[in-house]
Every structure is written in C-alpha cells, then in structure tokens.
Amino acid sequence: MRTGAGVAATFILSLGGAVATGSEPASAPAAPAYQDRLIATGDLAALPNEQDTADVDTSGLPRGWRVEAGVADTHYGSLDGHEAGLAIDGFWDTLSWGSWSIDALLHSGNSGDGGNGSSVTIWQRQMPFADGWSADNGLGVVNAPLLPLMRSGYRFTLPTSVMAGIETDWRQQDGIEIQGAFGEPGFYQGSHWADFHATGGQLAQVGVQMPWSSSTSSSIAAIGEHDVVPWWLASGQQVTATGAIPRVDAQSLYAATAWQGEDTQLQANLLAGSMSGGSTRTGLWLDAQTVGERYQQHYGAFRLEPDLSWGVLPFTSDIEGGYYRVDFQRAQWIWSAGVDEVRSISGTGVDGSYFNGAARYQARPWLAFGADATLKPGSDSAYSGDLFVDWKTRWGSSRLQYQQAQDSASRQSRQITWDQSLPTRENVHVSVSASFAAVDSAYGGTTRSASLATYGSYQLGDTVSLDGNVRWTHGDGPEGQHGFDGNLGLNWRFARAWTLSANYYESHASQRSPFVIDPISQSTPFVTLPTSWAYSLLIRYEFRAGSPAAVPGGNASGAGALAGSVFLDANGDGRRDAAETGAANITVILDGRYSVRTDASGRFDFSQIAAGEHRLKILPDNLPLPWQLDEKAANVVVVVKPRSDVRVDIAAKRSL
C-alpha cells in the first residue's frame, strides 16, 4: 500500500506527464512510471520507549548501578538448600583514574549451600600512566592473574587461583607486563549466588613478561602458598582422624620463552614445584605452530612428572609424549587430523597412542556434511566417531548426526541426534533436538533411550522476556532411566528501572553422555545424576546516568542492548543446541572496562550500551574441565545498532 506522499508524488508526476504529452510530438517516449520505494516495516527498529528516555541524568561521565535482591531454594539428592541474597554491581568512569566497578554480595544460606557470607570486589581498569603504561587493579574476591604466555598454551593451560585479596596487572604499550597478587585462597559455592568461601592460609603470586625483540618474548612467574587446604580437600568434606583438615605449603615456578617468525611460532615452557617439603616435581613442554596459506599445524612434546601442580592446584601430570595436529581449509573443504603419543612416567597412569580426524565438505551454500573419529588402539582399545549432515532451508538450520563409541570393557554406545534451529525474527531464538541412544554391555544387555529437548529465548514486547530449555528422556533396559530436566527464566520490566525475574529448574535422572575419548583421561559411561530442583525469585533495580546518553562505551550515537550466554558446546558446531548447557560464574568484560558474571544458566547481559562496535573478552578461569575457550571465542567483536537487542552465544569446546 502506498503512503500519502507516494500517492501525491504519483499524481503530480502523472499530471506532469499529461502536460508534457500535450506539448511534445506524439512519437516521444513516455516517462517511466513512478515506483514507491518504501521502507519495509520489519527493517525499521522500534522507537525508544519514552519511559526509558525520560528523567535521564546526562551530566557527568557514564556511571550506573544494579541492585538485585531475592531468594532461592534448591534440592539436590538428599540435600536441601535455602538462600537469600543481595547483590550490588556498579560502574563509573573517570577522566584520570580509569574505569571503576564494584561487585558486592550479601548471602545467607543453610549448610547445604555454604552458609552465610559476604564479599566485595572493587575493580579499577585501564588506569593511565606516563610512557604508555596502564594498570588494572582488583581488591576483594579476585582470580590471580595469568600472563599472556601462561594462557597461550595449545595443549596445556595453567589453572588460576580464586582468593580474597588484591591483584594488580601493569601493561606497557611495548609489550611489558607485570603482575602481582596476594590473599587468602578459597572456592565458590552456592546455587544461584556464587558466594566465596575462604579456606585459610596465604597465597602470593608474581609474574613478569618481557619482549626481547619484535619476535621474541619471555615470562617468569612464581606462586607461594602457606598453610592452605590442598585442592582435593578444598570443599572441606574430608578431614583427618582427629577431625582437623590437613594443611600444606606449596611453591611453584613457571618460565616460558616464545619466538614468533613469519609463519611459525614456538613456545618452550617449564613448570617446577613442591608441596610441604616434598621432592620438586618438574614439567617441560614445547608447543609449536606453523601457519600456511591454507593449513595450520600444531605440534609439540611434553614430559610432566607425577603430582605436578601450580601451587596446590593440579596440573596435568604423570605423562610424557608428543602430539601433532594439522588443520586444512580450501574452498569447500575443511579437514583436520592429529595423533597423540602418551606414556605414563610412573607406569600407573594412561598409556597409548591416540588418533583423531575430522572433515567437513560444503557441497552447496545450504548443504554440508562431514565426519570425525577418535581411536585408541591396543589392549585397552577404545574409539568414538560420528557422521553428520548440516543443511539450511526456510525452516532454519538443521543437523542430523550419528555417533558411536566403544571402550575397553566392550561397552558400545550408539546415538542418532537431530538438531533444528528454527527461523525467527530478531530477539527470538528457538532450537529443538531429538535423539535415540543404545548402550550394549557385555554383562548387562542393551539399554535404549530416547530424548527430546528444546531451548529458546523470546522477547514478549518491550517489557517481558522468556528464556529456557526443557529435555525429556525415556529409557528401557538394565540401565534405563526416565528423565526430565528443565530450566525456565522469566524477566518482567514493570517500570523503567525495575525488573522482576523468576527462574525454575528441575531435573530427574539426568545422565552424562559417554561419547568422548580423551588422551589424558579414561572414557566416561552413562552416569545418573541425583534428582534436583531449584527456584529463585529476584527483583532488580538499575540506574544509568552520564554523558553520552547514559551509556558506557561510546559517543552519542544511540543505544542498544547486548545479551548472550557462555555454553558447553557438546557437538562442536559452534551453535547452542537444545541439549547443551550453560557455564556459570564466567567473567565477561565489555571493552576492557565493564564486567559481569554469567548466572547459573550461563546467561549474561549489558542492558544499555552505546551503538557501535564493542569487544567482549571472556575469562575462562572458572570453566569446568575439560572445557576451554579458543582465541576466537574468548575475544568476540559485536556490532550494536541503535534501539537493537543483540544476542551472542559463546561456545566452550572440549580440550583436544
């Protein structure tokens, strides 16, 4: 349908054509007919809600607060937990002292969820100094920092300690970096609020990274811990015969040198440490990378002695060997292959050769298929593999996948899965998944199971959003289980600055999948988890102010919202499918200045940010093993348009 202006323009042009016809020869060509050029309704972003822009204080630099209060109840097996919490997050920019933020929590709960506690963390980021120096400082509950070379390992990555204390990270634009941390170590506990629990003792860590030239850099770091609880007793569940929790002292040293050539990168690493006067344990590993026009090769060697650790935190140990991997990409083909040779130094750990390979062929813009496999030959042979086909239609993106695995106990598993991501409008995501699995045991017959799952997020107008996933499982046979688990979150913004959130989770007889063969650990059978449920009810108040337009991160170009999740990508396709779960308590930093943590379902959001390009940095410190983030997933660039809601799902993948 034409607009009034379009109709008027057509009438005027028609009249002009008629007048011209009367004065020109009859043979003159007729003027081309006018065509309206209308903006499609679906391409025009909605105007901002007047309620959102009213009474905004635009004086001063960007600043804001978020206050969240609520209650939560949990049940896990035979344990019941009751929680109440008050969380306060805030940020404010300064001209000369960098960007500041605060993260405070007042938590009350019974013994099943860690008891009562409180914590406050203050961050100062990008504080400028002369000669190209800047600093990030943290006071409160922080993770001890790791130097870039400590995080860049392809095969092995050092763990990081969480503590109540202080940390500082100084960087110079020429590549020099100096870090330090001191505090009391501890651990996170709680279902909805990740409350910190100190375990006593002291931890000190220092490190420095120095570039020697444009192609060479080195780093050295040391950690010392005194009178601390060992990592295997960190939860306080195990005690000595006298009822006292044993404590230890630990010291570790890390050193690395990296060389970067035109197409080759080489990094040598040394880790040495001891615990409570024991003998020094040493680890050496070498990582190399060669990048060609269409291929990328990773190769290395390692020798990691038994009981190797970084402080009291465990590191991969009791193995020696090497690995080689190659990734190739050309036109429609992507394939990779790798081999690991692993031997136990003590003779009591894992031994063997491991082979893996994967291939994907993009047959059409809308069609691709591929396969991958992992094989461990020998007396304790095992394998896993899958075939898949991906296609896109008007019904969205689809994947059909067949998986098969067998361990050394002649336990064979087979599973066929269909994943479907449905086409939706902006701010809506819906995916469904269906699978059928069978497990054959040499001693217990065959167990069959079927499952159906769905995951979605939906924006109901301007004030209500819904996010959740549901999975149903039915099985029969010796290990058959009837299972159900669901997670549903509802957010209602009932006033300009106020939001009410309700979340519910329930799980019955859920199982972990066995379709993984890892060179460093044994394969895992189906493991039934205890019945659990949880609910939470929260009310949130948010305040934004400052110039420009009360949004952090940009100029007065309008504002939008950014939300998303960090999830465990079980099938490695980079897309969050219905049966894949979120990663909780992961720090997400916006533009190096403003940070949030993912909730129990892996969700995060920045409710109002400047339009334009932004960078997200995801810190993998609290990811569960064996999951990790590659360089691309840990550093994400997103573009936010005015009045738009952008969603990004960040995939953590199993370590190779």
Predicted regions and their residues:
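Structured interaction patches on ligand/partner-binding surfaces of diverse proteins
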Residues: D621-V648, A652
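A short, amphipathic beta-strand motif
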Residues: L562-L568
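Outer-membrane beta-barrel channel domains
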Residues: A31-K392, S397-A409, I416, Y535, ...
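Predominantly the C-terminal beta-signal and adjacent terminal strand-loop region
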Residues: Q481, D485-A556
